[in-house]
Amino acid sequence: MTDDQAKQVLHRYLRSAREALLWKLDGLSEYDARRPLTPTGTNLLGLVKHVAGVSSEYFGSVFERPFPETLPWIGEGAEENAHLWVTAEESREDIVGLYQRVADHADATIEALDLDSPGIVPWWRKSGRGDVTLQQILVHMVAELHRHAGHADIVREQIDATTGLYASGSNLPDHDAEWWAAYRARIEEAAQTFQGR
């Protein structure tokens, strides 16, 4: 595999993860898109906002190709965890639009650079990993995006039982709600044998 082919493969996985995360918002009310469903506040629109923010940095300033918009929830002086939730003043359209503009900016960076193009991640410097290549950042961001797409899978299922990798079809076996309830009951029964251990 050539470097160009490897870059295309990594880029395809990145785009796939972007799509998987974004479709989890489809058909949801503003409330359901924003509401926290874990003790630490994980919410679908916040995940999209977070990914937009980190992508703007990793495919922007890291390679001296800064994203042209200022994101007040990123960087020095930003409110802690402000990148993980959406305020009442921020609309879904604002966040999704930003996500798409950041993706376009990232795509332009990926297309313009070679896999061995150097970059610097200032916030990684303390750990001695600050000097990076586009390949390292692509791998990092593929992992980051797929991780958050997995979070979104679970959050969306908690909201309305919607599952699957893509809007075009589920990657789960095709069974009705009754089958899934019985399946879940079997898992719970097996787990109960270890309750208190």
Question: Model-derived features: where do they sit?
Answer:
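Short, contiguous alpha-helical
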Residues: K7, H11-L25, E30-E80, V121-R197
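A contiguous binding-surface segment within folded domains or other stable secondary-structure elements
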Residues: E79-Q136
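Short, contiguous pre-domain boundary segments
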Residues: M1-A6
